[in-house]
Curated annotation (Swiss-Prot):
One of its GO terms (biological process) is protein transport to vacuole involved in ubiquitin-dependent protein catabolic process via the multivesicular body sorting pathway. Keywords: Coiled coil, Cytoplasm, Endosome, Protein transport, Transport. It comes from Eremothecium gossypii (strain ATCC 10895 / CBS 109.51 / FGSC 9923 / NRRL Y-1056). The gene is BRO1. Residues 551-590 form a coiled coil. Disulfide bonds: none annotated. Belongs to the BRO1 family. The lineage of its organism: Eukaryota, Fungi, Dikarya, Ascomycota, Saccharomycotina. Residues 4-409 form the BRO1 domain. It comes from the Eukaryota. PROSITE patterns: BRO1 (PS51180). This is Vacuolar protein-sorting protein BRO1.
Length: 834
């Protein structure tokens, strides 16, 4: 069997100047001086040439390739502009394909969607035409082209719904998709039939034929749904002969399906049913022949479809089978037999539309990133900002984890003084002439000595005195505020508010050390410290290293080497963690998903969130590696602690009495308290200067405001006194009519006018400097110079704005308030700062 495909025609268009349109768009958006930075003249010219080639007289395959490439550029541009494509101010002019009475109609629109849909229509037509050419060589090679064309027209029928062009209307593109699907199924069926031994595959041919007939029935229903008379020449879309073609093929393949079903029933011994189906097949062939006669004048399908030969085969089979049934089988022939129970078999796998145009869209990405780099939708910037925030949160979590791990590492190394401890232990066990004192006690002594030195050398070791100093400064500030005039009430309220916040910060700071005041005083008194410590050691005899046998000495030295290796591993973990963190930051800084966001600009918010999660996956391995180093560090520190305890136990070879064990326990408890006190004092010593500097600067600002108000009142008073002696009388005779001198009315203080310049020399507070902060007062004709703001950075702002500040952060940085701009923000003082 042979067949022919319905010939589809291309849409025609008018020339378009992309270079001019892009240049005009960029000039309107970026101005005459900057637009050229975003314009690529060479690539714009290539786009113009590509459109010309896509609508030229090239061969089918070359023309199809040019149209697919051009569509990739259009899709890239549409992803950037979307519904705003009218801003290009282009007139897209297209003509309907020359099909029937409506062919050649001209349409003009300003939207890029019209250009896209028209180009896609031509792509579908070119695929169908290419299938028609390949049909001559092989039905099998033509099927994939028809399947791709079906994907294009199905996409158009679902996407472009309101086009003015008849070719692009959803019902018409849907009809073309159904027609091409039926033709692809037909080619698959004919390929099976022509493959030989059709009788053995009668069941398969029945299902394939019936499915093909059903597809053509859908095309027939398209013409019936429009209400067109079958005898009329006009059709809703396409050429008039198309209606007869789809009707003929529908009945033809219904007949083929009935014929093959009859063969199956005959083999099963159901002769009566077989005769009924053969009668139905003969009737279908007769109806198909009627529609073919309507095509006689068009010379269409005259040679391709041998309908007479197929009809003769069916009629001959009906004649012989009916005769056998009449003379031999006498089986009942049903009058209302049907093929509705036949299972459908769609042999055509229509590809996804993205699979058809996706490769060309991807191929155009790099060129379009240069050509359209000045056209980026605002939604992409917004989503890129959201993605950046996601990256920032991920990076912040990893940074916090690394900083916490580094802090734990440094604290452990500092408080154990591990390198020196290991050297001392190794020297003691290698040199038997060295001190035989308990290694644990020696370690405690050295650690206590370092803490005591740190406390004694600190300027803030008197906790009570520091509290009194702060209280005295606060009282001085309040005293100055009490004499500030009412006109500065707003500034006074803000300064008092800052004092309140500072007092809350002070409470947090001092609460860290108040539980350990006695211990800190003890560290500040060496005599008392060692007297207390020695009470836990005098009753304990020191172990003699000579009492250690060689096996235990070797075991201790082996433990020391083991701990030293663990310490090296600990340092390597820290270095590795730092390196991983650096690589992660570099990757985060280099990461750019603008291209992906443009390609997915039409996706929903939920789909974009899914895209974000997929993109963030590339950072997960770094987090896993950091987590692994933190986990290994914790285990390594535990192993070191266990190893040190083992060494201390091995060194103390003598069995301890209960009193000695109690003394050792009390010594450890005493050491633990002092360790906590030293930790708390270290935080206190670090943060207290910030608070003292804060109060000092606040006091200076308050004093300036107080002195300025006093100066203004004094100036106004002097001015009133000077004017009181003035007399506008020109002779002594007028005095009797003016017994009282005319004085000027008192003037209210004016904060908006500068005081007299001559008063400058009386004000100089440059020598009032505390904790290295120099506050130079300018002339009174200028507003007071405020202290420089303390930069807080991004992390500072995040901590300030976060209402859920963790308790751990509050403990580690109780004076975070002093790092905020607070009262040093000029905008806080409406009158004083003006």
């Amino acid at each position: 069997m042979k067949t022919a495909l319905i010939g589809l025609k291309l849409k025609d268009t008018e020339p378009l100047d992309w270079s001019k349109a892009l240049a005009s768009y960029l000039k309107r958006n970026y101005g005459q001086h900057q637009w050229s930075q975003f314009y690529d003249d060479k690539k714009s010219a290539e786009l113009d040439q590509l459109r010309i080639s896509a609508n030229s007289d090239l061969g089918l395959e070359a023309l199809l390739e040019q149209n697919l490439r051009y569509y990739g550029f259009l899709e890239q541009l549409y992803l950037r502009l979307g519904s705003q494509s009218v801003q290009l101010k282009l007139d897209y002019t297209w003509y309907d394909a020359e099909h029937g009475m409506n062919g050649g109609q001209k349409y003009k629109q300003h939207t890029l969607v019209f250009e896209k849909s028209s180009t896609l229509f031509n792509i579908g037509v070119l695929l169908a035409q290419l299938a028609g050419e390949q049909l001559r060589a092989s039905y099998k090679e033509a099927i994939p082209q028809l399947a791709r064309a079906v994907a294009c027209f199905e996409y158009m029928s679902e996407t472009f719904l309101n086009s003015p062009s008849v070719d692009l209307q959803a019902e018409n593109t849907g009809f073309l998709a159904a027609l091409l699907h039926a033709e692809a199924q037909e080619l698959f069926l004919l390929n099976v039939i022509n493959g030989g031994d059709a009788a053995r595959r009668a069941s398969l041919l029945c299902r394939l034929s019936y499915t093909c007939a059903r597809f053509y029935r859908k095309c027939v229903e398209f013409y019936k749904a429009d209400g067109a008379d079958e005898a009329a020449a006009a059709v809703p879309y396409g050429e008039a002969k198309w209606r007869d073609v789809v009707n003929m093929k529908m009945h033809l393949y219904e007949g083929v399906a009935a014929y093959n079903s009859a063969l199956v029933l005959e083999q099963a011994g159901k002769i009566g049913h077989a005769v009924g189906l053969l009668e139905k097949a003969a009737a279908s062939m007769a109806t198909a022949n009627t529609h073919r006669k309507a095509l006689q004048g068009t010379a269409y399908l005259r040679d391709e479809v041998d309908l007479d030969g197929i009809s003769s085969v069916v009629n001959e089979k009906l004649k012989t089978t009916a005769k056998d049934n009449d003379y031999i089988y006498h089986d009942h022939v049903p009058s209302d037999i049907s093929l509705d129970s036949t299972k459908l078999m769609d042999a055509i796998k229509v590809p996804e539309f993205d699979a058809v145009v996706g490769p060309y869209l991807e191929a155009a990405t790099e060129t379009c990133n240069d050509l359209f780099r000045g056209i980026v939708p605002m939604a992409v910037y917004e989503r890129e900002s959201m993605y950046t925030e996601e990256k920032t949160q991920l990076l912040r979590r990893e940074v916090d984890a690394v900083e916490q791990a580094d802090w734990e590492y440094q604290s452990f190394v500092d408080f154990t003084n591990l390198p020196k401890l290991l050297d001392d232990l190794e020297r003691r066990f290698l040199d038997t002439s060295s001190s035989s004192e308990d290694a644990e006690v020696v370690h405690m002594r050295e650690q206590l000595q370092s803490w005591a030195d740190a406390v004694r050398q600190s300027s803030f070791n008197d906790i009570e005195q520091q509290s009194k100093n702060i209280l005295r400064t606060r009282n001085d500030i309040m005293a100055l505020l009490s004499s500030v005039p009412p006109e500065n009430k707003e500034d006074v309220v803000k300064i008092k508010s800052s004092l309140l916040q500072a007092s809350q910060s002070d409470e947090k700071l001092f609460s860290q050390v108040k539980p350990y005041v006695n211990e800190i005083q003890l560290l500040n008194n060496p005599t008392l410290l060692w007297n207390n410590f020695n009470t836990f050691t005098t009753s304990q005899p020191t172990p003699d290293l000579l009492d250690l046998d060689h096996s235990k000495a070797d075991e201790v030295l082996a433990k020391i080497r083991q701990i030293r290796q663990l310490y090296e591993n600990l340092k390597l973990l820290k270095e590795e963690r730092t390196s991983i963190m650096k690589d992660l930051k570099d990757l985060v800084n280099q990461d750019d998903i603008t291209k992906q966001l443009i390609l997915n600009n039409n996706k929903s918010d939920s789909q974009i969130k899914t895209l974000f999660q997929e993109e963030l996956e590339k950072f997960r391995p770094f987090g896993s590696r950091i987590e692994a180093t933190v986990f290994k560090q914790g285990n390594t520190i535990k192993d070191i602690k266990i190893g040190l305890d083992t060494i201390f136990k091995l060194a103390d070879v003598q069995e301890k009495t209960s009193a000695q064990k109690q003394a050792a326990s009390q010594r450890k408890e005493f050491f633990s308290k002092l360790q906590k006190a030293a930790t708390a004092f270290k935080l206190f010593e670090t943060d207290l200067p910030k608070g003292l500097s804060f109060y000092d600067l606040l006091y200076k600002m308050t004093k300036e405001m107080h002195d300025l108000s006093v100066t203004k009142r004094t100036t106004d008073s002097d001015l009133a006194s000077n004017m009181a002696g003035l007399n506008i009388s020109s002779s002594k005779e007028t005095a009797k009519y003016n017994p009282q001198p005319l004085t000027a009315p008192p003037l209210a203080p004016r904060t908006y006018m500068p005081p007299p310049q001559a008063y400058n020399r009386n004000l100089d507070i440059r020598n009032a400097n505390t904790y290295g902060n120099n506050l130079n007062a300018g002339s009174l004709g200028q507003r007071p110079r405020l202290p420089q703001k303390i930069p807080t950075g991004i992390s500072g702002l995040e901590t300030q704005n976060d209402p859920k500040l963790s308790e751990e952060e509050s403990i580690r940085n109780p004076t975070n308030f002093y790092n905020t701009p607070s009262v040093f923000n000029e905008s806080m003082y409406s009158k004083f700062s003006h």
